[in-house]
Structures are given as structure tokens and as C-alpha cells.
A protein has these predicted regions:
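A glycine/serine/threonine-rich, flexible loop-to-helix segment
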Residues: 60, 71-101, 139-144
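Residue(s) in the substrate-gating loop at a strand-loop-helix junction
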Residues: 31
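Conserved catalytic-site region of short-chain dehydrogenase/reductase
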Residues: 34-36, 78
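Active-site-adjacent segment of SDR/Rossmann-fold oxidoreductases
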Residues: 36, 52, 57-67, 117-121
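C-terminal helical subdomain
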Residues: 92-177
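A short helix-coil junction within the Rossmann-fold of NAD(P)-dependent oxidoreductases
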Residues: 7-22, 117
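Active-site helix of classical SDR
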Residues: 5, 47
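Active-site loop immediately N-terminal to the catalytic Tyr-X3-Lys motif
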Residues: 36-42
Length: 177
């Protein structure tokens, strides 16, 4: 993702510096494993989480050149999913001709839209796409906090954390748990 996009960005920034118009899109592919974790796939989850973070940074850095950056976490039938018997069975094309929830084209339509002029102001977003459902993923962000006004003593942290965590939404469940 980074290597490919860095070459494209080099070209687009050059055009911008020459005063030529730029209307460019970066659309990265991440995974639900990177957004929510996945038991037994720490390496894959970390790599895919890195792509989501890369996307957010690209959006912040490249907007001034009229380059948008977004990511999609698709849930669709692929060669990789077909190689895992349990997933292949769950994601199989319906034999009765009903809606094919895991057909790759369900995701490709979102990609086409993100590449379109209509999406020119959409940047720094991570989406999940599965079947007829598109979701915005709202990842890591700072929520409630507690400030002691000074350095914390180790003995003080436990009570403060219990109170803080009692106010928070429960942590996201990791896939496979």
C-alpha cells in the first residue's frame, strides 16, 4: 500500500507544483481483522490496522494537493476465503439464486463510488462493506479521561481507572472470541 501510493503521490505532487489540476484518490484495502482484531492472526491484524492508520495519515497529509485517501474493509468471497473450508461454506454463492451476500461486486460498487467525483470531499474514512451494508468505522479516538493535576502515584491509579472504565462503552469484541 505505502510503496504503490508513494509513487502515485510523487506524480500528483509534481503536477500540483507545476500548477496543474489534481483530483486524485487513494483507496486502500484493510480488513475487519485490523479493525477489531482476529484470534490467531495477530500478524495479519496488525498489518491491516497499519493500513487503516496509513490511510488516516495520507488523508491529513495529502488533502492540500486535492488527493483523498480512504480505506475499505471488504467482506467478500475471495481466493483466500475460499481456501478455508469453514469460510468457503459460509460465504458460498446461494444455489437458489437469492441475493449473493458475499459477491465481490457488492464491495466493488463502493470502491467505484469512492473513486468518483461525487466522493471528492470524502477523505480520511475507513469503511466496512459486506453484502448490501456499508458502515463507517470510527476507530481509535480519545474519549473520557481523568487528570490528577500531577504525577500519578501507583496506588491512586486503580481507583481512578475503575471509575473511568465504569463510564466507558465496553471494548470491541475481537473476532473469534
Amino acid at each position: 500500500h505505502f510503496c504503490i501510493s508513494s509513487h502515485a503521490v510523487h506524480y500528483w505532487r509534481g503536477r500540483s507544483k507545476e500548477g496543474k489540476p489534481v483530483d486524485a484518490r487513494i483507496i486502500n484495502t484493510t480488513s475487519g481483522a485490523g479493525l477489531q482484531g482476529s484470534i490467531g492472526q495477530s500478524n495479519y491484524a496488525a498489518a491491516k490496522a497499519g493500513i487503516a492508520a496509513l490511510t488516516l495519515n495520507q488523508a491529513a497529509e495529502l488533502g492540500r494537493y486535492n488527493i483523498t485517501a480512504n480505506a475499505v474493509a471488504p467482506s467478500a468471497r475471495t481466493g483466500m476465503t475460499s481456501a478455508v473450508p469453514e469460510m468457503a461454506e459460509r460465504m458460498a454463492k446461494p444455489e437458489d439464486g437469492s441475493f449473493d451476500h458475499f459477491a465481490p461486486e457488492n464491495v466493488s460498487n463502493l470502491l467505484a463510488w469512492l473513486a468518483s467525483a461525487e466522493a471528492e470531499s470524502v477523505t480520511g474514512r475507513v469503511f466496512e462493506a459486506e453484502g448490501g451494508r456499508i458502515c463507517i468505522c470510527d476507530g481509535w479516538r480519545t474519549t473520557a479521561g481523568v487528570d490528577s493535576g500531577a504525577a500519578w502515584a501507583p496506588a491512586e491509579i486503580g481507583a481512578a481507572m475503575k471509575a473511568l472504565l465504569a463510564e466507558e462503552v465496553p471494548a470491541q469484541q475481537v473476532w473469534g472470541t
